[in-house]
Amino acid sequence: MTPSNTLQKLRKYLEGRTGKAIIDYNMIEDGDTVLVCVSGGKDSYTLLAMLMALQQRAPVKFRLIAMNLDQKQPGFPADILPRYFESIGIEYRIVEADTYSVVKEKIPEGKTTCSLCSRLRRGIIYRTAKELGANKIALGHHRDDMVHTLFLNLLFGGKLKAMPPKLVTDDKSHVVIRPLAYCAEADIAKFARGMEFPIIPCNLCGSQDNLQRQKIREMMQEWDKRYPGRTESVFTAMQNVVPSHLADADLFDFRGLTLDTPVDEGDIAFDAPEMPISGMIPISQTA
């Protein structure tokens, strides 16, 4: 089936956003071997599609290996991803590890399993990357994930911390990259529907989204309905940090501040912040 013009335009747009993120953060370099983690969800399918497309015309040469971790969850359709990988001609590795039973044994019934499951999964991914000689590990987190994580840490963890587009693993063996950092979840969802990817449900283990993360998601969706562009604005703020106007003494030398210390954005101590009014709804209309 030939993709529609709308889908082609969306693909081109997402490829552009992905390529820009890769360039801005120097995510992929010549000679890299990139392990692409594919769970069977819309995000990881889109990630793989973007990287394969960019590989064809990138000025640098890099190798892609798709990986899926079969955690032996009841009902997991183990044949779907191998068949899909073969149909698109991508080198791949299926890793089988019964982390499902381990988690069920360790975590009491009714308690969230996500934390332990994530740690086990991460260890297996790192080990597989080492076995395959991959120096980069690509994950399918997108812009919305990064913004939601910022608010999770801000509201529930007391930290101004989000999800970075690029990081080094604790053992210093690999660089983890998030090439979809500039892509909105809504665009990814539209693309995945248009491409008719064979989506595998993400709740086979019976666990639901972390309640706090779900609340953040609902909050951001409501904000974007009332004030369009808020998620994009928050993400832009993550790229424009002014340490001198926060309160972290490790990032800015407040103790050593003198009359000669240069301060970003000058003296605004007594000024009300000027906020853009475009897209904002007057308080009287929201009461």
Curated annotation (Swiss-Prot):
Organism the protein comes from: Dechloromonas aromatica (strain RCB)
Taxonomic superkingdom: Bacteria
Gene3D superfamilies: HUPs
Pfam families documented for this protein: ATP_bind_3
Enzyme class: transferase
Record keyword Iron-sulfur present: yes
Catalysed reactions, as listed in the record: cytidine(32) in tRNA + S-sulfanyl-L-cysteinyl-[cysteine desulfurase] + AH2 + ATP = 2-thiocytidine(32) in tRNA + L-cysteinyl-[cysteine desulfurase] + A + AMP + diphosphate + H(+)
GO biological process terms, semicolon-separated: tRNA thio-modification
InterPro entries referenced in this protein's UniProt entry, alphabetically: Rossmann-like_a/b/a_fold, TilS/TtcA_N, tRNA_Cyd_32_2_STrfase, tRNA_thiolation_TtcA_Ctu1
Name of the featured protein: tRNA-cytidine(32) 2-sulfurtransferase
Span of the annotated motif PP-loop motif: 39-44
Name of the gene encoding the protein in the UniProt record: ttcA
Listed GO CC annotations: cytoplasm
Matches recorded under PANTHER family: AMINOTRAN_5 DOMAIN-CONTAINING PROTEIN, SULFURTRANSFERASE-RELATED
Annotated binding of [4Fe-4S] cluster, by residue: C114, C117, C205
Pathway(s): tRNA modification
Cofactor descriptive note: Binds 1 [4Fe-4S] cluster per subunit. The cluster is chelated by three Cys residues, the fourth Fe has a free coordination site that may bind a sulfur atom transferred from the persulfide of IscS.
Primary site of residence: cytoplasm
GO molecular function: 4 iron, 4 sulfur cluster binding; ATP binding; magnesium ion binding; sulfurtransferase activity; tRNA binding
Function: Catalyzes the ATP-dependent 2-thiolation of cytidine in position 32 of tRNA, to form 2-thiocytidine (s(2)C32). The sulfur atoms are provided by the cysteine/cysteine desulfurase (IscS) system.
Source taxonomy: Bacteria, Pseudomonadati, Pseudomonadota, Betaproteobacteria, Rhodocyclales
Recorded family membership: Belongs to the TtcA family.
Keywords linked to the UniProt accession: 4Fe-4S, ATP-binding, Cytoplasm, Iron, Iron-sulfur, Magnesium, Metal-binding, Nucleotide-binding, RNA-binding, Transferase, tRNA processing, tRNA-binding
Subunit structure: Homodimer.
Required cofactor(s): Mg(2+); [4Fe-4S] cluster
Extra facts: The thiolation reaction likely consists of two steps: a first activation step by ATP to form an adenylated intermediate of the target base of tRNA, and a second nucleophilic substitution step of the sulfur (S) atom supplied by the hydrosulfide attached to the Fe-S cluster.
Protein EC: 2.8.1.-
Subcellular location: Cytoplasm
